[in-house]
Amino acid sequence: MTGKIEIITISDAVRLAEKGAELMHNAAGEAVARKDSFAVAVSGGSTPRAMHRLLSQEPYLSDMPWQKTHFFWVDERMVPFDHPDSNYGAAQKDLMSMIPIPADQVYPMPAMMRPEEGADLYQAKLKTFFQDLGSLDPVFDLIILGIGTDGHTASLFPGLQIRRRIAGF
């Protein structure tokens, strides 16, 4: 994918899932051709679930470069992974358990600790991953975000007061 921003408007949920799977497939192919790996960050909620289910089926099941794909999350609920509200748990059920991806290339956010501790641990994991690729900054090949009916994305809700924290990458 290029650095150019393209806005695609799709009003049908089924077509949205199909387009998302297609875009992810294309981004993965381009990233692997360019640098031999694909780093994607996904959100939770209902938006990506249909896309995840499509990616776990043909033609994506056998055509995606799963062995070179690395999955990260943009947000997580502070619940066990087997809880119905877990973003990782939903992705595990709909996608990860169905595809041939090495377990050490799936990076769920720590959910069973204080949020600040989990954020620090995840930041360190991201830093190590991207430094090992030779990048000083975390630059994902693709970030997939959903938008809730109230306008929230990645657990950032309208009107939510966010405590600013300086993070050193």
In which residue ranges do the predicted regions lie?
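A glycine- and small-aliphatic-rich helix-loop capping segment at beta-alpha/alpha-beta transitions
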Residues: 53-64, 89, 93, 158-167
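N-terminal glycine-/serine-/threonine-rich phosphate-binding loop
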Residues: 1-40, 116
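Glycine-rich beta-strand-to-loop/alpha-helix junction loops that act as flexible
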Residues: 42-47, 145-149
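Ligand-binding beta-strand-loop-alpha-helix segment within the catalytic cores
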Residues: 2-4, 64-144
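Short glycine-/acidic-enriched loop or helix-start segments at secondary-structure transitions
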Residues: 51-53, 83, 118, 154-156
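Class I SAM-dependent methyltransferase SAM-binding "motif I" and its flanking Rossmann-like core
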Residues: 145-169
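Short, well-ordered amphipathic alpha-helices
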Residues: 24-27, 50-60, 92-93, 123-130
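Short glycine-rich or small-residue beta-strand-to-loop segments that form or flank ligand, phosphate
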Residues: 39-43, 72-75
